[in-house]
Amino acid sequence: MTPAVTQTILTVRIARPHGYGYVLLSRGFSALNRPPPNYPGHIPLTTFERGALAVGSAIGSLLNPRRGDLIAALGEATATPYFIYRLRDAMLSDPTGRRILRDRPRISSKTLSIEYLRSLPPNTVGRTYVGWLDREGVGPDTRAPVQYIDDEECAYVMQRYRECHDFYHAITGLPVVVEGEVALKTFEFANTLLPMTGLSMFAVMRLKPAERERFWKLHLPWAIRSGLASKEVINVYWEEQLERDANELREELGIEKPADLREIRKMMRRQKAAEEAAKAKDGQ
């Protein structure tokens, strides 16, 4: 092989029990067999690679639901060939969705003034959003760029969904704990039909018994009911809604606000502490 022929390596992360980490498996593919990228950062995949990426990232994200990179890879590997196109078509069929596709806005600390959002009146969408970011200790710059979706426009749709995820958190009030993430992902599945959001429900098995019971009885019915009843959230131009009343926007979208999960968890912890204190007192 001449020096002009380069070798491209795709690393497929397949999680296997190995302490607290996972084993990385690599397979090399000749650049001659790989089509050129369709946009900056694009990594074209063969059918085998896409399947391996889906399986590996699914296992890895199940073992560690906090691995955002694996969840992102799973989302991209399972979104094609149908689901991301359905979401793109939903945007094309909506006037606001078409504007979003034309304008290609991005959500980051460079495009949103966090200090301005903090100055907005209470209960506005912007103040609710930044309040949620502050409370959860996260920021708008944590979303990885899309790499594995071939169609450039569909890649933007996935990027837009990914960057709007925290707005979904803020408008529903769900925290970033695993219980809150699973509830929100279930809502997103009912609303967007992206397979990754549905597969995230398997993380329920990692919840504590009380949390699982709460999910089945409280969060799952809410997520299905609200996700199916609400408008397509991908078509919300969040940048234009920042000064609106959050309750008004929820009503317009048809999103029912779930029970305050943080307050529920606090109440359960207080109740457990009181029960343990009572047992300790009885044992004296």
Swiss-Prot record:
The enzyme's E.C. designation: 4.1.1.130
Swiss-Prot/TrEMBL catalytic activity: a 4-hydroxy-3-methoxy-5-(all-trans-polyprenyl)benzoate + H(+) = a 2-methoxy-6-(all-trans-polyprenyl)phenol + CO2
Required co-factors: Zn(2+)
Keywords: Lyase, Membrane, Metal-binding, Mitochondrion, Mitochondrion inner membrane, Ubiquinone biosynthesis, Zinc
TM region(s), chain numbering: none
Pfam families on file: Coq4
GO CC annotation: extrinsic component of mitochondrial inner membrane
Pathway named in the protein's UniProt entry: Cofactor biosynthesis; ubiquinone biosynthesis
Residues involved in Zn(2+) binding: 165-166, 169, 181
Membrane topology: Peripheral membrane protein
Record's subcellular location: Mitochondrion inner membrane
GO terms for biological process, alphabetical: ubiquinone biosynthetic process
Main location: mitochondrion
Note: This protein may be expected to contain an N-terminal transit peptide but none has been predicted.
Protein's job: Lyase that catalyzes the C1-decarboxylation of 4-hydroxy-3-methoxy-5-(all-trans-polyprenyl)benzoic acid into 2-methoxy-6-(all-trans-polyprenyl)phenol during ubiquinone biosynthesis.
Family: Belongs to the COQ4 family.
Quaternary structure, from the entry: Component of a multi-subunit COQ enzyme complex, composed of at least COQ3, COQ4, COQ5, COQ6, COQ7 and COQ9.
Protein name as catalogued: Ubiquinone biosynthesis protein COQ4, mitochondrial
Species for this entry: Blastomyces gilchristii (strain SLH14081)
Phylogenetic lineage: Eukaryota, Fungi, Dikarya, Ascomycota, Pezizomycotina
